């Protein structure tokens, strides 16, 4: 198989990054890739999707990785997994990997171990240059579920029509489900018995980097990995609800210029010239001509360590940094003085944030269950809303119209292959009820 053939298979299957922003996976394949790094870190607390896939589908994942390795002529595959999760791996499969290109690489139980810059360093020892992507150092980083989707596309020509999701938080039993893409999140939670949300809010994603769910309108997408339920009064919810202008006002009133937000920043500790305290200072004091203090936020990964762990004043620097980063992207502003760090900072090892410390600081220890059950419920929603923008790049354009009959797996929208985007498929059998500028709506 050639790289071009692999790219077209993965594009046609609608595969995007399942654990992050949804970057179209076919665009990552390159003959410049020397090492494939699999993100099995399960970076944020309470998330369990990767656990289940590694426990029950490791053989399939390894098979797909070998195909990727052969196609790109990569030298090795490194599956980055925390030591505490090694017991999940099938011993027979692990033994079969000895002497092969696929290696299990133990990484520390710290946050954010799943950030691609951190993960690349922990697995390969390489530091990705500022403002660059992993392939610049010969690395491709890929999520566990994404690899599993590639396996299904290669073996069965199966497109992405469903999503593995952990449902957890302030509920009696955490579960992992496989839900059709486009199902209303409200309907999904109701179907598994967690539809009563009086006095509670739902987070799409982890407790650090997730977003609040609009429970009446939000749907399952290709990047939905976790739905966490917390009381409305919980600190996680209050942090996510705080408007960025309030964060700026609080910073101007309460920031003590201690620099702890910079000192604890995972990217700074890897040698990046990202000094969060300078952004807080410039924004709160209106230093609009201090351009570097704003442009440097292009290097921020939004992990939230500065907000949750570092700041002793209860400020949220990461909220400000990500707001600025979004504005930089919107207006096409780039930081031109990016450099290649020569080494990590000497203090890095002493400033890593353990998962246990993070759980304690977030106040979610009581929500950590001893096990998470995978349930095999087959969901049968009356209506599906296939969002046209579930990925990085251009939105997909509908290829169907109201009244068209579709089957699960049929193409309903796509972004042209030459553009950055992907293909959308029906996740149920039914009839197209409506096509809007945001959704293809399918009903029975």
Residues of each region from the PLM?
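Short histidine-centered loop motifs in beta-beta connectors
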Residues: 396-405, 409
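Hydrophobic alpha-helical positions that pack around
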Residues: 75-187, 191-198, 206-207, 231
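Extended boundary segments
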Residues: 126-129, 143, 335-378, 440-441
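Conserved hydrophobic positions within beta-strands
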Residues: 430-432
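Ferredoxin-type iron-sulfur electron-transfer modules in oxidoreductases and energy-metabolism complexes
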Residues: 230-252, 262, 267-344, 381
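Gly-rich Lys/Arg/Thr-decorated short loops/hinges at beta-loop-alpha junctions or inter-strand turns
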Residues: 38-50, 171
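Short beta-strand-turn/beta-hairpin segments enriched in glycine/proline and small hydrophobics
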Residues: 373-394, 415, 421-426
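Short hydrophobic beta/alpha edge segments that flank linear recognition/processing sites
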Residues: 407-421, 439-441
């Amino acid at each position: 198989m050639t790289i071009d053939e692999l790219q077209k298979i993965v594009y046609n299957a609608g595969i995007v990054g399942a654990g992050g922003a949804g970057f179209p996976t076919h665009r990552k394949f390159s003959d410049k890739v020397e090492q494939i790094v699999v993100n099995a870190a399960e970076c944020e607390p309470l998330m369990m999707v990767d656990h289940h896939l590694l426990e029950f589908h490791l053989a399939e994942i390894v098979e797909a990785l070998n195909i990727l390795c052969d196609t790109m002529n990569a030298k090795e595959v490194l599956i980055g997994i925390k030591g505490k999760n090694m017991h999940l791996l099938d011993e027979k499969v692990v033994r079969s990997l000895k002497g092969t290109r696929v290696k299990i690489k133990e990484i520390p139980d710290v946050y954010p171990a799943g950030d691609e810059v951190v993960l690349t360093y922990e697995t390969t020892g390489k530091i990705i240059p500022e403002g660059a992507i992993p392939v610049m150092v010969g690395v491709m980083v890929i999520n566990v579920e994404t690899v599993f989707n590639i396996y299904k596309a290669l073996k069965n020509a199966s497109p992405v029509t469903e999503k593995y999701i952990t449902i957890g938080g302030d509920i009696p039993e955490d579960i992992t489900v496989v839900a059709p893409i486009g199902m209303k999140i409200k309907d999904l939670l109701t179907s598994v018995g967690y539809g009563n949300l009086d006095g509670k809010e739902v987070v799409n994603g982890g407790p650090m980097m997730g977003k609040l769910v609009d429970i009446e309108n939000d749907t399952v997408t290709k990047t939905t990995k976790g739905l966490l339920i917390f009381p409305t009064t919980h600190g996680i919810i209050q942090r996510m609800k705080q408007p960025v202008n309030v964060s700026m006002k609080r910073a101007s009133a309460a920031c003590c210029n201690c620099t702890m937000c910079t000192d604890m920043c995972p990217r700074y500790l890897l040698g990046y010239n990202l000094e969060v305290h300078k952004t807080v200072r410039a924004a709160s004091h209106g230093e609009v001509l201090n351009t570097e203090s704003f442009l440097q936020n292009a290097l921020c990964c939004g992990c939230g360590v500065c907000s949750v762990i570092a700041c002793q004043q209860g400020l949220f620097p990461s909220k400000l940094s990500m707001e600025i980063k979004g504005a930089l992207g919107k207006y096409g502003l780039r930081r031109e003085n990016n450099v290649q760090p020569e080494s990590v900072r000497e203090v890095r090892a002493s400033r890593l944030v353990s998962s246990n410390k993070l759980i304690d600081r977030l106040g979610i220890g009581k929500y950590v269950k001893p096990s998470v059950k995978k349930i095999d419920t087959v969901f049968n929603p009356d209506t599906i809303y296939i969002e046209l923008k579930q990925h990085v790049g251009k939105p997909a354009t509908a290829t169907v119209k109201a009244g068209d009959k579709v089957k699960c797996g049929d193409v309903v929208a796509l972004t042209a292959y030459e553009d950055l985007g992907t293909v959308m498929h029906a996740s149920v059998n039914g009839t197209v009820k409506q096509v809007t500028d945001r959704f293809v709506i399918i009903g029975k």
